Amino acid sequence: MAELNAPAPAPPRRGRALAWVLLGVVAFLVLLVVAAPAGGVARILEAAGAPARLALPSGRLWSGSAQLYLEGRDLGRLQWDLAPGSLLDGQLGADLVLEAPGHRFRGRAGVGTDGRLQLTGVEGEVREASLDELLRPYAIEPSGTVTFRDGSATVQGQRVLDAHADARWSGGPVSYALGGQLWRQRFPPLDATLRARDGQPVLVVRDPAGEELLDVALDAAGWAQLRVRYRFVALAGFPWPENPAPDTVVVELAEQLY
């Protein structure tokens, strides 16, 4: 009796064709991202309702730059380079550089599927020009430079979930108006740390001996709470009617930042 051999199966042409189609679609999307103008980033921020705004974009969506504004304030020129490797961690990440005449920062930003913004590896410096602009509304004229290192933060919406950074001010002469008089004092270099405490970012400033001078806490409602210890008042050379212990909190202020 003759054996009947079943015909060989046809090659999976349909599956191969589908794979080529998908590969073509992916290549087309990658080409769109690479070739898209940098203005697309500004439109994405606007659609997301972010408080930041980009103007005068140049370059491409993949690698470009634009002028960064936050709450209407010009923060300088922002440069970005998308980091495709961050997609393996479930994030859309980019290496960033922010530069202005009075400051320069660099680091990496990533947005996860949960909408959280993560900043890592932040370092930079704030020079006298930006320090003066920042403190002028409080009748303070500083000098010197503040350097930052080991900076990181996690932000969701307008809430700061976690924050970490170390900073150092080079010190120098400072003029300030208080009690209807103008005071001048030379300060030594001061160190500061930014840490999360009870779910709130807290900035602590210390003297060269490591003793606390003041601290600022930012709560979930956008209020910054400032506490000044007598040790700082004495360091500033301001006469105080009493002579309390150095750790005594003598000034408490609150200001809503957002």
Question: Which residues does each PLM region occupy?
Answer:
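Beta-propeller and related beta-repeat scaffolds in trafficking/envelope systems
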Residues: 78-87, 160-201, 239-257
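N-terminal beta-strand/beta-hairpin edge segment
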Residues: 52-139, 151
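Aromatic-capped interface at the extracytoplasmic side
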Residues: 28-55
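Short, hydrophobic/proline-enriched secondary-structure or compact coil segments at domain edges
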Residues: 94-96, 116-124, 165-167, 202-205, ...
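Non-cytosolic head/periplasmic domains of membrane-anchored proteins
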Residues: 105-189
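Extracytoplasmic/luminal low-complexity segments enriched in Pro/Gly and acidic/polar residues
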Residues: 199-258
